[in-house]
Swiss-Prot record:
GO terms for biological process: regulation of transcription elongation by RNA polymerase II; transcription elongation by RNA polymerase II. Residues 238-268 have a biased composition (Polar residues). This is ELL-associated factor 1. It is found in: Nucleus speckle; Nucleus, Cajal body. One of its GO terms (molecular function) is transcription elongation factor activity. It comes from Homo sapiens (Human).
């Protein structure tokens, strides 16, 4: 002891127990292993493999972290027996101190030889971890193009509902035409009767004037009267021109009435 206290040991007294390696027929053996070089890529969470061959030749195979090259490291060496060396095992969970006797000391060196088939199969069964790279994340995929949505089309209305049926309008036109025809016929009949009355009255006036002139002697020359042309021309106008215009208008209205009736029949 160099005088420096081991942090794993305290200054209290503990009960020391001899392990199974001190029995007459030991059920366990303990060895020490020394490596000349141990790579940092060795996976300490996985189990390795130790093989003892002929002539105390020892081969140790330790796996590497997944994704490393090579996938494992192989160590080879030999062992030498120990005579008086022991190892102290301290269980910090139970506080128990156990002393075990060392059987041999193994010293190995790193080689380039491949490991055993068991380690190789175990490495192949383990899922490989993808290598971590510092590549930037891929850009997001482009958004798909969407056509602009059309506004909803309102319910279509039938033209028959929007435009009312023309039959009521035709009926109204027929009534108006018939009323006009009746009015014109009444006007023409009244104008004919008035013209005949005026002609008969004018004839009786002429007869009375002629008979009065014969009785009273020679009559003075007739003075021009403004009523005679006024009375005669309206008679002519009422007797001839007025009925002709009314007849033409009646014919036109009748034709229109027939056309409207024929049109309504064709629509039906």
């Amino acid at each position: 002891m160099n005088g420096t206290a081991n942090p794993l040991l305290d200054r209290e007294e503990h009960c020391l127990r001899l392990g199974e390696s001190f029995e007459k027929r030991p059920r366990a053996s303990f060895h020490t292993i020394r490596y000349d070089f141990k790579p940092a890529s060795i996976d300490t969470s996985c189990e390795g493999e130790l093989q003892v061959g002929k002539g105390d030749e020892v081969t140790i195979t330790l796996p590497h972290i997944p994704g490393s090259t090579p996938p494992m490291t192989v160590f080879k060496g030999n062992k030498r027996p120990y005579q008086k060396d022991c190892v102290l095992i301290i269980n910090h969970d139970t506080g128990e101190y156990v002393l075990e006797k060392l059987s041999s000391s193994i010293q190995v060196k790193k080689t380039r030889a491949e490991g055993s088939s068991k380690i190789q199969a175990r490495m192949e069964q383990q899922p490989t971890r993808p290598p971590q790279t510092s590549q930037p994340p891929p850009p997001p995929p482009p958004m798909p193009f969407r056509a602009p949505t059309k506004p909803p089309v309102g319910p279509k209305t039938s033209p028959l509902k929007d435009n009312p049926s023309p039959e009521p309008q035709l009926d109204d036109i027929k009534r108006e035409l018939r009323a006009e025809v009746d009015i014109i016929e009444q006007m023409s009949s009244s104008s004919g009767s008035s013209s005949s009355d005026s002609e008969s009255s004018s004839g009786s006036d002429d007869d009375s004037s002629s008979s009065g002139g014969e009785d009273n002697g020679p009559a003075s020359p007739p003075q021009p009267s403004h009523q005679q042309p006024y009375n005669s021309r309206p008679a002519v106008a009422n007797g001839t021109s007025r009925p002709q215009g009314s007849n033409q208008l009646m014919n036109t209205l009748r034709n229109d009435l027939q056309l409207s009736e024929s049109g309504s029949d064709s629509d039906d």
